[in-house]
Amino acid sequence: MTETSIAAQGTVAAIGERDEFSALLQKEFKPRSDHARSEVEKAVRTLAEEALRSASVVSGEAVKTIQSIIAEIDRTLSEQINHILHHEAFQTLEGSWRGLHHLVNNTETDEMLKIRVMNISKKELGKTLKRFKGTAWDQSPVFKKLYEEEFGQLGGQPYGCLVGDYHFDHSPPDVEMLGQIAQVAAASHSPFIAGVSPTTLQMDSWQELSNPRDLTKIFQTPEYASWRSLRESEDSRYIGLAMPRFLSRLPYGAKTNPVEAFDFEEEVEGADHRNYVWSNSAYAMATNINRSFKEYGWVSRIRGIESGGAVEGLPVHSFPTDDGGVDMKCPTEIAISDRREAELAKCGFMPLIHKKNTDFAAFIGAQSLQKPTEYEDPDATANANLAARLPYLFATCRFAHYLKCIVRDKVGSFKERAEMERWLGDWILQYVDGDPANSSETTKAQKPLAAAEVVVEEVEGNPGYYTSKFFLRPHYQLEGLTVSLRLVSKLPSGKGA
């Protein structure tokens, strides 16, 4: 028998086996349409080619044979998808979208609360602002977009808060950009919230945060001169830098985050956070800001565990440890102690603190980047401290938005100085709590002022022009409490009895 005839017989045998196998699959899967029948036949051809290529014998159990091949395909796909998901550029992109999703999904938008998204990278923003340095800063497209088109225009809707999905450090380009952003934010009375990079503290990641003994000493070196100057500027109170990042999603896997398309297990090492997806914590702070505005009409309750600073429902991933136990991945990159949180706030940051063994975190403080100026007068120092905290600044900004709009509407009407002062005084008193010592937390959130006073003065030589000064005293929020415990034989209140 010739080789040609043997090969022909082998081909006929292969075709015969494939037809039998095809019939077996048709019986097993019972396709109900021509398309389904075509897909089964296509799978049979692929399976036959694979079997002949590897010189293996196809099992008589069609389902098991297919499952083994599918498992190999899943393994190959998983390896490729892992490479894609864990690429730094893809992780950054996914973290940004999931952070925005967190903000939108946890915000009740309506005609009074809107979210607008501007697609501009940090590099593009820096280049745009750099072209309009110095006295030309108010000619930049950014200024015109944020100020002139809304706050500076009749019928405009001023932005209450700006959120940048960026991470800044103490490098000269970043410091310069933050200063320019602060100018625009101050002019439009819209605080800017963004993230801070661990390189600001000479770290590769936030997992090194517990290493330094004293964080404040880091900022005393010469390379932080421009950073210190930025913090001492007036406009820096409009900048809020949140840290660290929060976990965006659970790793993909059958037991954590199943994928329907194929059997995919994402490769993550629990102790190493580089393969996880993290989002900018500025989104978490923005969510609290929106929630406070929705519930109370004011951005006053955005910090504290029980007063609006909570970030709930964070993804929780547990993993086996080397010693045979089970540990939980911190959803905020690193657990921050109370002492370190106070240090970070003093440095001008807003740390997100994770509650141990829970899916709960919170912003304890809401300190702006500004370093409050210390004066000889204690009252002046207290005023500077208040102005550097975001809950008080947000209230002041909202009053600024309203005042410009309502005063603009009054231009051209007949108003004397006393009449204007009385009218403005009556308006501001709507937001003053009449009994701050006994009112509830809800009342204080809805009426953010404990006291207010308005002074209107005429501009000499320019009839019809007035200058006004608003003195606003907000409700003070608890910043800390020093506790002293003493063992005594008799209480002090009972000594005089």
Where are these regions (language model features)?
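A glycine- and small-residue-enriched flexible loop/hinge signal that marks low-structured segments
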Residues: 2-58, 108, 120, 146-402
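Extended assembly-interface regions of large multimeric machines
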Residues: 48-132
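Structured, hydrophobic secondary-structure cores that serve as assembly/anchoring elements
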Residues: 69-89, 107, 291-307, 311-497
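Core mixed alpha/beta domains of very large multi-subunit molecular machines
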Residues: 97-116, 126-156, 173-183
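Amphipathic alpha-helical scaffolding segments
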Residues: 98-101, 179-187, 422-426, 487-490
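A short acidic, often aromatic-flanked loop/helix-cap motif at beta-alpha or helix-coil junctions
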Residues: 122-126, 201, 462
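Eukaryote-specific, cytoplasm-facing alpha-helical/coiled-coil scaffolding segments in long proteins
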Residues: 123-128, 189-191, 429-431, 494-497
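Short, surface-exposed amphipathic charged segments that create phosphate/polyanion-binding patches used
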Residues: 130-135, 207-212, 470-471
